[in-house]
Amino acid sequence: MSITGQPHVYKKDTIIRLKPLSLNSNNRSYVLVPQKGNIQNIINHLNNLNEIVGRSLLGIWKINSYFGLSKDPSESKSKNPSVFNTAKTIFKSGGVDYS
């Protein structure tokens, strides 16, 4: 299988393969619209949405930390000084960024 056939991120001679949404061996199906209006179906519907949003958010955080947009202690490739610290130091040094 070629590398372009898989979801991946390429940066600085490093290829990171992305995991699919379903991390388990069984494929999950998400019902985004409850068929019936009872309370249990609505709860199941909201739980499905929470799981999708939660997994997406974790993936976004990992990608942001990899590209240096935020610091993630569990990711060794993320930038050590946060990009938010750059704004604090650049004005103190007269416009020169020493980080």
Swiss-Prot record:
Q: Tell me, what's a Pfam family for it? A: Cauli_AT
Highest taxon in the source lineage: Viruses
Record's signal peptide: none
**What function is annotated for this protein?**
This protein is involved in virus transmission.
Record's family?
Belongs to the caulimoviridae ORF II family.
Question: What is the name listed in the Swiss-Prot or TrEMBL entry for this protein?
Answer: Aphid transmission protein
Origin species, per record, is: Cauliflower mosaic virus (strain W260)
- Which classification does the entry list for the species? Viruses, Riboviria, Pararnavirae, Artverviricota, Revtraviricetes
